[in-house]
């Protein structure tokens, strides 16, 4: 854009040297105005820096959300069954891993069943069949009855 400004003063016959002299201070003034705006932007960045702290907090929240565990639920069930019994952190970690493994096995089996039946959706029927295949004997029966009870409660609510 600077060459265009120089072309305009060149088209004006005698005033060209004076305009160039004026153009230079204008060019100097424009960056000064931009410099004044730059600190204002820095001031605007400082509150967003606080927002970045907020972003860091939300990043921490996102990290917490990624590590979903069943620890709270394991503890609640433990207190229902044995109210005076505690559990160590290592045992809690083992139980959490156990639940994740069982969940993965049931989900994988249900996915296979839906593929065998050429259905795109995993329904409660596939889950129920997968539980019967993955869990042994009496445990499968109890899991199916509890699952059926939970689905009935969910659909009625």
Curated annotation (Swiss-Prot):
Record's Gene3D superfamilies?
Histone, subunit A
Its subunit composition reads: The nucleosome is a histone octamer containing two molecules each of H2A, H2B, H3 and H4 assembled in one H3-H4 heterotetramer and two H2A-H2B heterodimers. The octamer wraps approximately 147 bp of DNA.
Q: Name the InterPro entries on file.
A: Histone-fold, Histone_H2A/H2B/H3, Histone_H2B, HISTONE_H2B_site
Q: Matching SMART domains, A to Z?
A: H2B (SM00427)
Write out the GO MF terms.
Answer: DNA binding; protein heterodimerization activity; structural constituent of chromatin
Does the keyword field hold Nucleotidyltransferase? Answer: no
Name the residue ranges with Basic residues bias.
26-42
Tell me the protein family, please: Belongs to the histone H2B family.
**In this entry, which stretches build a coiled coil?**
none
Subcellular location(s) per record? Nucleus; Chromosome
For this UniProt record, give its keywords in alphabetical order, as a comma-separated list.
Chromosome, DNA-binding, Isopeptide bond, Nucleosome core, Nucleus, Ubl conjugation
Crosslink site: Glycyl lysine isopeptide (Lys-Gly) (interchain with G-Cter in ubiquitin): 153
Residue numbers spanned by region Disordered: 1-64
| One Pfam family hit | Histone
Q: In what way is this protein post-translationally modified?
A: Monoubiquitinated to form H2BK143ub1; may give a specific tag for epigenetic transcriptional activation.
The free-text function statement in the UniProt record for this protein reads: Core component of nucleosome. Nucleosomes wrap and compact DNA into chromatin, limiting DNA accessibility to the cellular machineries which require DNA as a template. Histones thereby play a central role in transcription regulation, DNA repair, DNA replication and chromosomal stability. DNA accessibility is regulated via a complex set of post-translational modifications of histones, also called histone code, and nucleosome remodeling.
Query: What protein am I looking at?
Result: Histone H2B.3
A Gene Ontology CC term for this entry? nucleosome
> Is Nucleus a UniProt keyword of this protein?
yes
